[in-house]
């Protein structure tokens, strides 16, 4: 009997502790929700004061620290891609500014030091006849040319397919390739791309991407009447003064008029 009483007391204590913890958790969740709701209302008022609005579906993302990353240019990968597109008999020309141009009887491919690429080559397998076939053909081309990206996504408009792919699990807002299938049996490639694995420098530089600050700064530069739909933290690929490719932390903010 004595043990039964002790057991009941212990169970009661455990229930009381659990109820306390549950109540404390609920209170904190309510506090966080109230704080987020208050911040959302304040931001909407401030953006409205700038002459713009936030879409009803807009949600402010969390602040994040992103390290500055570097990329080594791979001339070997550039040449391999060009050789598949143009054939083994292509000629290679390199200019002083780092531009490398490949040319054959089938077309041309030009890579620039900042990661930009453009070219024209024959369409493998013939011209697709609808958007579904265009996506399928583009994915096949990117894969065969060594230009497929891990976690890539695709958008199609007519016979133009755009591939985007993240780096280090973060979007790179200007890293994309567009492949357009032409009626004459050729394909036109354009965009900005990178190969290899990014890495940090010894200094480990980076940026605190503060969403509210970036949003208000952006809103102050908008034309009156624009609606902000979303914002995403990520990178922008660019070349530094030493001609090294870098991934610079930045926000992409989408409105109803521009990206």
Language-model region placement:
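Glycine- and small hydrophobic-enriched segments that form the cores of compact globular domains
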Residues: 133-181, 187
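Amphipathic N-proximal alpha-helical interface segments
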Residues: 99-123, 163-200, 254-259
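Extracytoplasmic/luminal low-complexity segments enriched in Pro/Gly and acidic/polar residues
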Residues: 184-259
């Amino acid at each position: 009997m004595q043990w039964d009483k002790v057991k009941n007391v212990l169970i009661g204590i455990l229930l009381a502790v659990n109820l306390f913890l549950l109540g404390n958790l609920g209170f904190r969740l309510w506090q966080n929700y109230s704080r987020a709701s208050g911040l959302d209302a304040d931001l909407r008022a401030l953006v409205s004061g700038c002459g713009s609005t936030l879409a009803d579906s807009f949600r402010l993302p969390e602040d994040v620290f992103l390290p500055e990353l570097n990329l080594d240019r791979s001339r070997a990968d550039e040449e391999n891609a060009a050789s598949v597109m143009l054939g083994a008999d292509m000629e290679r020309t390199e200019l002083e500014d780092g531009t490398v141009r490949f040319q054959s009887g089938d077309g041309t491919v030009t890579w620039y030091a900042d990661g930009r690429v453009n070219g024209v080559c024959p369409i493998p397998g013939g011209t697709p006849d609808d958007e579904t076939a265009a996506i399928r053909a583009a994915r096949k081309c990117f894969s065969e040319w060594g230009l497929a990206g891990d976690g890539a996504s695709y958008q199609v408009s007519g016979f133009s397919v755009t591939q985007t792919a993240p780096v280090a699990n973060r979007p790179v807002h200007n890293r994309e390739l567009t492949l357009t299938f032409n009626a004459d049996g050729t394909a036109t490639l354009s965009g900005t791309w990178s190969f290899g694995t990014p890495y940090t420098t010894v200094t480990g530089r980076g940026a605190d991407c503060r969403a509210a600050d970036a949003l208000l700064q952006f809103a102050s530069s908008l034309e009156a009447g624009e609606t902000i739909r979303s914002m995403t933290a990520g990178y922008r690929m660019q070349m530094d003064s030493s001609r090294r490719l870098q991934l610079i932390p930045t926000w992409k903010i989408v409105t109803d008029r521009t990206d």
